[in-house]
Amino acid sequence: MNSENTQIVAALYKFVKLPDFAQKRDPLLSYCQAQGVKGTILLAQEGINGTIAGSRQAIDSVLWFLRSDPRLADLEYKESYTETPPFERMKVRLKSEIVTLGLPEIDPTEKVGTYVSPQEWNDLICDPEVTVIDTRNDYEVNIGTFQGAENPQTGSFREFPDYVVHNLDPTKHKKVALFCTGGIRCEKASSFMLAQGFAEVYHLKGGILKYLEEVPAQESLWQGECFVFDERVAVSHGLEEGSYELCFCCGYPISEEDKISPKYEQGISCAYCFDSLTEEKRARQQEKWRHYQTQVANSKNRDVS
């Protein structure tokens, strides 16, 4: 994509001690807004995590601003492209964790698993002695995952430690390979598993996004699409925009095939939320959808005038 409308989408994170993280919020927000960058950045004592979008010059400027702090000088990011702005505004939030596991004693800056490059990943997960685990939430796994990977069926990352405790055994699962969207969840997951006594814990460096960017489709062991937390909903090989969209009612990712279901009604319900909708909830949702359509129509009229 090289058109003037192309947006650079930059996903970034780094675990690093930032005791002054609260003081960084306002200057960072002001700088991002001045560059016209939109998205969300989380700041916590344990580091930084976020996804932002903007022009090439704007993204480069924000990265320069972040890296001007010596603690973030080696901040890495993953880049993809879109013609449609994926965010509506810029937010910088202060959090207790940049990815919520709920175990503050787990510190990836002190102990973390072994990084595996996208080019080496296929060989690792094809090893019959390796247990491959998708650390993402169930709704993410359902639209795409690696061949042979286990799905912990978690509703949030906070549930991952319980999954490990009740389903895995350090004496039986001697080699474990973890993966997630961009790598951040695996940092904490691998740190936690090492603390639980697992001897060999590997994780995909750069996450699924880096794998889809660097590994040719014909060599890939990835099946489906990768859920992303912005307006694109999902991406495929080469980080091309995928085919999913979010149900307006429940926010679950739905495919074109899902829309064939008799339980799907645009703006009202999908197969994943239909059975939970009472008549009262359905009426509220219909009103919400009508209000949304009016907002969209008014916005288009303003753009034309």
Swiss-Prot record:
UniProt keyword Hydrolase present: no
UniProt entry keywords in alphabetical sequence: Oxidoreductase, tRNA processing
Ranges for domain Rhodanese: 126-220
Biological process (GO), any one: tRNA modification
Active-site residues per Swiss-Prot or TrEMBL entry: C180 (cysteine persulfide intermediate)
UniProt cross-references to Gene3D superfamilies, sorted A to Z: 3.30.70.100, Rhodanese-like domain
An annotated Gene Ontology molecular function: oxidoreductase activity, acting on paired donors, with incorporation or reduction of molecular oxygen
UniProt catalytic activity: uridine(34) in tRNA + AH2 + O2 = 5-hydroxyuridine(34) in tRNA + A + H2O
Enzyme Commission number, as recorded: 1.14.-.-
Enzyme class: oxidoreductase
Protein family: Belongs to the TrhO family.
Family matches, as PANTHER family: RHODANESE-LIKE DOMAIN-CONTAINING PROTEIN 7-RELATED, THIOSULFATE SULFURTRANSFERASE/RHODANESE-LIKE DOMAIN-CONTAINING PROTEIN 2
Function: Catalyzes oxygen-dependent 5-hydroxyuridine (ho5U) modification at position 34 in tRNAs.
HAMAP family on file: TrhO (MF_00469)
The name this protein goes by in its record: tRNA uridine(34) hydroxylase
Species of the source: Nostoc punctiforme (strain ATCC 29133 / PCC 73102)
Organism classification: Bacteria, Bacillati, Cyanobacteriota, Cyanophyceae, Nostocales
Gene: trhO
